């Protein structure tokens, strides 16, 4: 796996699923391929994206700044600086300085990542802030190692939280989660269907599913009534794709 592929993988792992994630993935691909060279426009676009947490925006801004060639005097962006200040905690800053001194001696991506993984996410963010604000300089490979270690820590905590929700025995939470997933799947079906005549059937199925979820929420239904709703939708989507000549494995 190439270095940039690895960086893209780690960074995208902390971005919530949805149309915005696909958009960010495309931007990262363009940046890594040298197709997008307007850092100012890229940062302005990132700043105004909804849904993303300030830290995720800060990490993406740091990645773009490291990768896109720019004039030396280009102003640093406040939204990135604020996100990478370790919540203003002096302990984070102390640890970040210690980590920075170690990274300065490290020139490889994997070496930097291994060193960084033993620090907290707050210290890692502060260390990125030091480098972003030009208070310290490390090799690009070491900076990417720092970024990937931070993303791994964030993704780990997100995974634990997600696993807790998926394995919860609370029927109301499970019911709502199934309805949210069904609604999201229906929306994706509508986007994938496009405007061809054959798409009408898939659009109809998706529309009915969304109406059903709305009705279930409006009148309040038994927690078991949503079981299998998303899977039914995915089976419909696969049947539609088969008719269109597209063979895809199950999303489940």
From Swiss-Prot:
Residues 165-252 are annotated as: RNP-binding. Belongs to the influenza viruses Matrix protein M1 family. It is found in: Virion membrane; Host nucleus. GO terms for molecular function: RNA binding; structural constituent of virion. Gene3D superfamilies: 1.10.10.180, 1.20.91.10. A motif (Nuclear localization signal) lies at residues 101-105. This is Matrix protein 1. Disulfide bonds: none annotated. The lineage of its organism: Viruses, Riboviria, Orthornavirae, Negarnaviricota, Polyploviricotina. HAMAP family: INFV_M1. Most abundant protein in virion. When expressed alone can form virus-like particles in transfected cells. Homodimer and homomultimer. Interacts with NEP. Binds ribonucleocapsid by both interacting with genomic RNA and NP protein. May interact with HA and NA. Cannot bind NP without genomic RNA. It is a peripheral membrane protein. Plays critical roles in virus replication, from virus entry and uncoating to assembly and budding of the virus particle. M1 binding to ribonucleocapsids (RNPs) in nucleus seems to inhibit viral transcription. Interaction of viral NEP with M1-RNP is thought to promote nuclear export of the complex, which is targeted to the virion assembly site at the apical plasma membrane in polarized epithelial cells. Interactions with NA and HA may bring M1, a non-raft-associated protein, into lipid rafts. Forms a continuous shell on the inner side of the lipid bilayer in virion, where it binds the RNP. It comes from Influenza A virus (strain A/Brazil/11/1978 H1N1). It comes from the Viruses. Keywords: Host nucleus, Membrane, RNA-binding, Viral matrix protein, Virion.
